[in-house]
């Protein structure tokens, strides 16, 4: 990529460092979209031994780019996101991608399409891990930062995304168990 163009796209991507997500970190501050994407990518790398048939490079790229559209729209929590929100993010991302040079433009467009369709192993792994990372982060945050509907989300969110994999289902089950322990502990403290 030409140097000036690289700096331009990096500047846009840098915005994700300042885009807050709904969830809090264990240190008590709002998590950024960049932090979520970073840990999602680590998760993909660290579970790759469970999926030797998956294209790890493609999976890592999916994880790295999956929320770039939020540099333009901010993060809208999944339980608030509407079809209109999704369309706006997709439109702005498509406009931005159109300005990329080849081969990055075509590769990223193909990756986004594959991620949306979720037919390939890599796309299914990415989406499952994306959901799981959010659940894990909620378990790591102070439960007093949870809103009421998150108690139910911690039990159900992502179940459909992990169903294709015994390993990811086991990970989801353990995350759910951690959520139950956290909720039970809060109940004990409030007595």
PLM feature spans:
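Active-site helical microenvironments for divalent-metal-assisted chemistry
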Residues: 1-191
């Amino acid at each position: 990529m030409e140097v000036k163009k690289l700096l331009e796209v990096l500047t846009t991507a840098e915005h994700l460092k300042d885009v807050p997500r709904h969830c809090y970190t264990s240190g008590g501050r709002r998590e950024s979209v960049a932090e979520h994407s970073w840990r999602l990518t680590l998760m993909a790398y660290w579970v790759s031994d469970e999926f030797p048939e998956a294209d790890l490079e493609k999976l890592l790229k999916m994880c790295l780019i999956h929320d770039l559209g939020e540099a333009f729209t901010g993060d809208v929590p999944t339980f608030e996101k509407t079809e209109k929100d999704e369309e706006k993010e997709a439109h702005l991302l498509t406009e931005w991608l159109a300005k990329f040079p080849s081969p990055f433009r075509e590769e990223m467009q193909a990756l986004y399409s594959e991620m949306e369709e979720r037919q390939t192993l890599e796309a299914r792994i990415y989406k499952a891990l994306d959901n799981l990372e959010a659940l894990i982060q909620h378990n790591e945050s102070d439960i007093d930062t949870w809103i009421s509907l998150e108690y139910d989300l911690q039990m159900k969110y992502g179940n459909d995304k992990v169903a294709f994999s015994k390993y990811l289902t086991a990970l989801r089950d353990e995350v759910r168990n951690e959520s139950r322990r956290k909720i039970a502990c809060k109940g004990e403290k409030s007595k």
